């Protein structure tokens, strides 16, 4: 299974495979046509409370990862759907955050690889 992460604002490429948005909110200023999202799994994103608490603060990264992984344990249906898509071909997890290292897609990718 090939799974990677990418900012949704980056240019879509054929190599992206199935493009899955893993944000709870639609990215600002981006039309559906430009985003070229194949699947929007907003339910797999961190809860609104966790997202607001984290606020993309790198100092909270370690605790954010722990809390988000705990939330993912209750999202088996969504994780299963994502794994099923990944078994069919390449998948790109899309996120809107500016920080490429500290975002939920990075944690989700780690978790998917761990569960494979």
Residue ranges and their predicted role:
Residues 1-116:
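Residues lining hydrophobic/aromatic ligand-binding pockets adjacent to catalytic sites
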């Amino acid at each position: 299974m090939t799974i990677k992460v990418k900012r949704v604002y980056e240019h879509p490429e054929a190599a992206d495979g199935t493009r899955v948005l893993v944000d709870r909110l639609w990215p600002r200023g981006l039309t559906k046509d430009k985003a070229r999202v194949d699947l929007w799994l907003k339910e797999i994103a961190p809860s609104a409370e966790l997202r607001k608490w984290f606020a993309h603060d790198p100092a909270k990264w370690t605790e954010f990862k722990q809390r988000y992984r705990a939330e993912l344990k209750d999202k088996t249906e969504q994780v299963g759907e994502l794994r099923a898509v990944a078994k069919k071909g390449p998948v790109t997890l899309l996120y809107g955050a500016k920080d490429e290292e500290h975002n939920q897609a990075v944690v989700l990718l780690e978790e998917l690889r761990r569960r494979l």
